[in-house]
Curated annotation (Swiss-Prot):
It is a peripheral membrane protein. Pfam families: ABC_tran. GO terms for cellular component: plasma membrane. SMART domains: AAA. The complex is composed of two ATP-binding proteins (BtuD), two transmembrane proteins (BtuC) and a solute-binding protein (BtuF). This is Vitamin B12 import ATP-binding protein BtuD. It comes from Citrobacter koseri (strain ATCC BAA-895 / CDC 4225-83 / SGSC4696).
């Protein structure tokens, strides 16, 4: 399969790399590793928000050559933190992110899927942390959703599961799976190894800015690889037909 994004010897001073890899259309790729591994730095680089050593090719062209407005049509990026806009209704904030403003049904569908239907009229700065996280997720999904944007290709998510309960995480997983089935590539950072083991197609395991392992989730999330990354021992178990990782240290 042709790659959507290629990274070649990408590096950030003291924080990242050099590392190389690729992202394929319609896949879910998880970035995993301990705090300080470089996941957020790598996502920002892939989003075109920072530049440094190495090359990032997106859809056949160097990421540095993409005009910001055009890039926003093709990729959406959820930063780890973002303050809510002052006194802006949620529906207005979401509409700003949706390229085709006529797709009101899509906005309502995404809001309903994430449990936001009763929050659309509220001001963004009056939401709880978990509510605001779901609003931000809805915004980036609307930005590149194929029903509102035929150019959408890539969704980058930095710790998207933060502040979400189990039911909300499950709802987000369903939405991401739907996007994936429509050809959108999804790259997200995660601290939940068992979530990665269940939902990722591929994984990159990082430690101190270095890529320790990359490939299919089963090939990457092995006890030896995880011990190298986290400095502790792991076991992989099968529990009622589901694979599970547990620490043994």
């Amino acid at each position: 399969m042709i790659s959507l994004m290629q990274l070649q010897d990408v590096a950030e001073t003291t924080r990242l790399g050099p590392l190389s890899g690729d992202v394929k259309p319609g896949e879910i790729l998880h970035l995993v590793g301990p705090n300080g591994a470089g996941k957020s730095t790598l996502l920002a680089r892939m989003a075109g928000l920072t530049f440094g050593e190495g090359t990032v090719i997106f859809d056949g062209a160097s990421l540095e050559t993409w005009p910001a407005a055009k890039l926003a049509q093709h990729r959406a990026y959820l930063a780890q933190q973002q303050n809510p806009p002052f006194s802006m209704p949620v529906w207005h904030f979401l509409t700003l992110h949706q390229p085709d403003k006529t797709q009101t049904n899509l906005l309502n569908d995404v809001a309903q899927a994430l449990g936001l239907s009763d929050k659309l009229g509220r001001s963004a700065n009056q939401l709880s942390g978990g509510e605001w996280q779901r609003v931000r997720l809805a915004a980036v999904i609307l930005q590149i959703h194929p029903h509102a944007n035929p150019h959408g290709q890539l969704l980058l998510l930095d710790e998207p599961m933060n502040s979400l309960d189990v039911a909300q995480q499950n709802a987000l997983d369903r939405l991401l799976s739907q996007l994936c089935s429509q050809g959108i590539a999804i790259v997200m950072s995660s601290h939940d190894l068992n979530h990665t083991l269940r939902h990722a197609h591929r994984a990159w395991l990082l430690k101190q800015g270095k890529l320790i392992a990359s490939g299919r989730r089963d090939e990457v999330l092995t006890p030896p690889n995880l011990a190298q990354a986290y400095g502790m021992n792991f076991r992989r178990l099968d529990v009622e037909g589901h694979r599970m990782l547990i620490s043994t240290t």
